[in-house]
């Protein structure tokens, strides 16, 4: 919130019904962004769902991490270098699953059980559910990549 965004770098996805409307919409979009693509409503819907996973959900996980750190007297900023490196690796590849790390991808059940025990002592039972669901998804995905 409150950050300035260089709109030229933001991809815009356009849809139109006539060639004339298409020219108008494309001209306007190209005046705003260097990345303009055509996409119908269904494709934009899938794109939006992907953005929610990549941005909204990851930010929520940052918030959970922040709460866990706060209980130890630490600021979320301590994870900054790790978060930035992880994001940089993910966007530098066409297959973020290929650069996935952590106990789930390694099948390190000892570490995962230890984490689950820690999370079980938290005031929010959803933390363990989220941890288990994501770990299972990471493990299953890692077997396919």
Task: Cite the ranges covered by each PLM segment.
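Internal alpha-helical scaffold of NAD(P)-dependent oxidoreductase catalytic cores
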Residues: 1-92
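Interdomain hinge/lid region at the active-site interface
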Residues: 70, 81-145
């Amino acid at each position: 919130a409150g950050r300035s965004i260089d709109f030229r770098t933001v991809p815009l996805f356009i849809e139109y019904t006539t060639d004339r409307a298409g020219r108008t919409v494309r001209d306007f979009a190209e005046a705003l962004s260097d990345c303009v693509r055509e996409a119908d409503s269904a494709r934009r819907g899938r794109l939006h769902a992907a953005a929610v996973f990549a941005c909204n959900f990851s930010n929520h996980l940052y918030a959970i991490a922040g709460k866990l750190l706060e209980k130890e007297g630490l600021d979320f900023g301590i994870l900054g270098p790790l978060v930035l490196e992880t994001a940089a690796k993910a966007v530098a590849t066409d297959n973020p699953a290929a650069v996935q790390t952590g106990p789930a991808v390694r099948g390190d059940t000892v570490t995962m059980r230890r984490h689950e025990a820690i999370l079980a002592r938290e005031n929010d039972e959803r933390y363990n559910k989220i941890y288990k669901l994501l770990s299972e998804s990471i493990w299953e995905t890692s077997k396919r990549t």
